[in-house]
């Protein structure tokens, strides 16, 4: 159903804060069901890095509490020269999903409980990429995914509008 990929690797602090490329930050993945392209930072890139694409899913791999492990974020648009931070891993599906559906189902309580169960650690928690890939999610027809995804995207939009008041 897809393959995993790593975030940035082999970087030093001198590579960050400048450069023609951008990367999706840990907080972007942690905070947003759909990647926010305004929450990217500059990085100097070499040839051996993985570009992100529309449809990719990102997961945080480390946190201070089990409840915050494995937060997910979906890349819902195309962007050039964009990469993933080194504290996350990516998943590139080979099947077609409604991206809004995927974004919200991966943050639903049932999926989050699976992630919490997989958290390993005492003062710092980590998660196994291989174990995450074993988790099953409900996949209705694409048409139904689209309806559910649109519903939650609209609901999220209404909540955002209400919070601005």
Can you say where each PLM-predicted feature lies in the sequence?
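A short beta-sheet element
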Residues: 25-26, 42-107
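Non-catalytic DNA-recognition/assembly elements of restriction-modification systems
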Residues: 1-9
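DNA target-recognition patches
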Residues: 11-43
């Amino acid at each position: 159903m897809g393959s995993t990929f790593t975030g940035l690797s082999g970087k030093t602090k001198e590579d960050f804060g400048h450069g023609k490329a951008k990367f999706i930050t840990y907080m972007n993945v942690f905070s947003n069901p759909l990647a926010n392209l305004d929450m990217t930072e500059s990085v100097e890139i070499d040839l051996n890095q993985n570009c992100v694409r529309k449809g990719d899913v990102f997961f945080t791999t480390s946190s201070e509490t089990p409840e915050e492990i494995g937060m997910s974020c979906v890349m819902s648009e195309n962007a050039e020269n964009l990469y993933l931070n080194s504290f996350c891993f990516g998943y590139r599906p080979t099947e077609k999903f409604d991206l809004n559906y995927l974004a919200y189902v991966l943050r639903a309580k049932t999926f989050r409980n699976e992630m919490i169960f997989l958290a390993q650690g005492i003062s710092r928690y980590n998660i196994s990429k291989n174990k995450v890939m074993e988790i099953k999610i409900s996949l209705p027809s694409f048409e139904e995914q689209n309806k559910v995804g649109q519903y939650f995207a609209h609901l999220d939009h209404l909540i955002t509008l209400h919070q601005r008041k």
